[in-house]
Amino acid sequence: GGPGQFNYFQQIDVNEDTGLIFMLTTSGKINVYEMETGKFLYDIKIPDKETAQFAMLNDTLVATFMLNSSGQQKERIYISSQKENILNTFYRSDLFEVKSGTRWLMMSGIDRYMFRYKDLICYKEFYNDTLFVVTEKELQPRYIFDLGKYSIPIDCRMEACDGDWKTYNTIAAPYIRNQVIETDSLLFMPYNYWAGEKQRERHMVLYDKKAKECFSVPGGYIKNDFPGALPLRPATSLDRNTLVSVWEVGDIMKEAEKNPEVLEHPQLKKLTEDDNPVLMVVYMK
């Protein structure tokens, strides 16, 4: 116990087979808890780096991901053991120079760089066209997403613009950033434009893994056939066929203006404007 356990948690990972919860803290450690009781068990030290996200390869082996906010962060993923020993390092080649030396980074709270599908640890950067599977020995390419003319060049990134928002908002406007959420039958790919007037627009593409076909979802949300139900735009997956959509209360109220039946749902009837975001869990057939 002790004050050292109480930190800001950046991310969590779960091993349902062993009943353990792993929480990345701002103190350079991963706290490990028992799922059933919430009891603190032990902590795992990670490399003394600016870790953005992590995933557990097993209960003692950690993959930690570093953002390239400086332009010169050569290491992108460390594989380390419980004793902080670095066992392997995966590097990046898309380096650039920021003249002022100031760090700039475009990211949001829903960005996912490392995530799970079945027993695989998957990794994808928004600046990278490849989704990799992370193992102790290598990064294995799993999917390549050809954005073509919509792939943002290095010199159009916010980091490379050295904080010049006006320039960035113009030169980055034609390019898109996409997430990837994998289920057994589909790849969900929500995307939006990096900057400009279309930045707030929401788009989504689905890829049918069996038919090997890709198709666009009008309006960026999947229509919900249940009366008064909210449409679906997944933010993440819980397992191979369970999706989670996150709704801010303000967005639900706007949706209710178009469809008042939304607030007739038993769990939304008492919703107020200062409530926390609403999580919608969707189970795929």
Residue ranges and their predicted role:
Residues 1-6, 45-52, 93-98, 146-151, ...:
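Short coil/turn segments at the loop-to-beta-strand junctions that recur within blades
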Residues 1-4, 39-45, 87-90, 96-103, ...:
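A short beta-strand motif characteristic of beta-propeller blades
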Residues 34-38, 80-84, 134-138, 208-211, ...:
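Short loop/turn segments that connect beta-strands within beta-propeller blades
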Residues 1-21:
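Blade-loop segments of beta-propeller domains
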Residues 19-25, 59-71, 78, 112-133, ...:
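Short beta-strand elements that form the blades of beta-propeller/WD-repeat-like
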Residues 78-139:
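Loop-centered beta-sheet repeat module
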Residues 142-171, 209-240, 253:
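Conserved blade-ending motifs and adjacent loop-strand segments that build the rim/top face
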Residues 6-12, 48-57, 109-112, 174-178, ...:
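Repeated scaffold domains used in trafficking and secretory/extracellular systems
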